[in-house]
Amino acid sequence: MKLHAALKNPLIVHARDAEAAALDILKSEDAGEVGFVMHCFCGTLETARGVVNAGGHVSFTGNLTFKKNAELRAIAAALPLERLMIETDAPYMAPVPYRGKRCEPWHSMEVARAIALAKHLEFDEVLAQTCCNTVKFFGLPEAVLSSAPQ
């Protein structure tokens, strides 16, 4: 984490089943100053809000689309869209309707659709904002947005 801060690079955190403990460490290290994202978030609403309040992003994968994960969709609905990211965990965790098949990066569109449904927003709005969030998070040139999916 010290290297992350020194290089001013955003931190990607994989903290499966340890989201709250990881958040405590991230807060103690002021990780929000440079930026961090909780990859493949599966924690609680309280932890997700803590991530946002600490300056981090919450990222969802194909598991958001699974029937059993209504609570995870409620968490996505409760968070500000400006703090959400979408991703896959390819080649694993393919979203519905591709569940059981090899996950591909383009399946992240299904994650965006699930967020749009959960938040009662248009798919295009979710896709545009999560693309902007990603560009800003990684410090990419804004020209990247002109090639973003429409």
Model-based region annotation:
Residues 34-38, 57-62, 146-147:
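Short hydrophobic/aromatic-enriched beta-strand-loop microsegments
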Residues 93-95:
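Amphipathic alpha-helical segments at domain termini/boundaries
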